[in-house]
């Protein structure tokens, strides 16, 4: 076949294939154009999820008749100077969107320049039959797109159901609206209003907060930490959720570079790393984070849809984002999700109580009875007492802490005011600590709480150059489920040795352990090694040292901590609460579960109609 030039309409249809994938792509390009046009109000109207009709109206600067005629040609733009290609501050700059959309639809554009006497209109069908006429219109621009993909029926066949396409469009509008809280947005579908967002005109932080409430929800703000982080050429602001407020997917993560919504793997990995100490691997935080960076340090001209970016120094950006998120979480370190307490109160409103069953016995810290035995047998009671649990008791024997605990018992009223988690009143089911503050009741999961304390302590311990090990009097032989798990541990033996664990292969699927970290005390070695093998076997030989340390720390912390089913004295309970108050991120264990919930007295009173 002879080589020949493609026609202009064919070129535009090919370009549309890169830029326009679905109705949401059209809405994204046209709404971003409206934002670039200094609009303060943008209205979107859809029919059949945009397949039949898309209308975008704005009150921006508008266009003259000559600008209107040029705007629908390829590679025409008013948004940047050719001499300043590395300093792009607008959404659009390629000059591809309008001609690409026009090539696959029936387009009508009506526009009036600000302070102009006349409005003008241009009509295109499949990118052809361009005709500019005088029209009547308010200041700004209105673009109507009908019969999307009529000129490319093959693409039309690949569109999803209306519900799916509409959801994609709503997501696009929400992201743009989050980045521009001063602009009012409305979205209507088949006559039904789906979004109505009022523009905010206060200070930047207040504007952003209100827009996030309107788009993501007030519940998120109540359970989120505010980020405010700056360097000379970089700034990060926004909100990120407390670890206990999480999701099963990353869909609710909104990340922006210079107000441009991006799906960048570097940023997603940084977010994951920032939460690795606080969330299970199958849970994801919610966030709306905005990074402002010198345009010359980021390349947005990587992908036609501009969803991906390239940083001049990616590691620098990654490390700054991790630091910013960790700082924000640390400042909100003792706060657990408010929704957990709300859910608990909802259950109280409709209790599922068996009237035949007696109320379970509660251990009162003021009771002198020593003959209490749990009514329910727990296999955990057969596990040897952990050396670290004894350390917690030993810590209390120090004169200073002893005196502190005595003072708190003697001056309970003062304790309620002075300490966030209050004074311990009872232990429920040898698992939960009930404490009282000035205006609330706090229920603490003793295992989850001590696991967080242990996690932070062991994390610091593993950073020390000289790890103290204890040699087992009798080496422990641990038989694993299969040879793969045994090989996995053996493959990592040198790294594990540096983390305080000495082991060797013993047969096909067994490991012999000769030394363990001293901090673990009288730990159940069998269970420790089995759990560690389960953690590591999914990763094989290629796991990074940082990930290995994370897995080892989690496993150590779980075996280090006080178990459910262990009776605690008043002194031990109060000591645990005080340690929580002084430990970063003690509101959740390292799996993202809450360590305590707080029930406000006013909410409890409402349950009783007071």
Curated annotation (Swiss-Prot):
SMART domains: DNA_mis_repair, MutL_C
Biological process annotations from GO: mismatch repair
PROSITE patterns: DNA_MISMATCH_REPAIR_1 (PS00058)
Pfam families: DNA_mis_repair (PF01119), HATPase_c_3 (PF13589), MutL_C (PF08676)
GO cellular component, one term: mismatch repair complex
GO molecular function: ATP binding; ATP hydrolysis activity; ATP-dependent DNA damage sensor activity; mismatched DNA binding
InterPro entries xrefs: DNA_mismatch_repair_CS (IPR014762), DNA_mismatch_repair_MutL (IPR020667), DNA_mismatch_S5_2-like (IPR013507), HATPase_C_sf (IPR036890), MutL/Mlh/PMS (IPR002099), MutL/Mlh/Pms-like (IPR038973), MutL_C (IPR014790), MutL_C_dimsub (IPR042120)
Entry keyword set: DNA damage, DNA repair
Function noted in UniProt: This protein is involved in the repair of mismatches in DNA. It is required for dam-dependent methyl-directed DNA mismatch repair. May act as a 'molecular matchmaker', a protein that promotes the formation of a stable complex between two or more DNA-binding proteins in an ATP-dependent manner without itself being part of a final effector complex.
Family: Belongs to the DNA mismatch repair MutL/HexB family.
Protein name, as recorded: DNA mismatch repair protein MutL
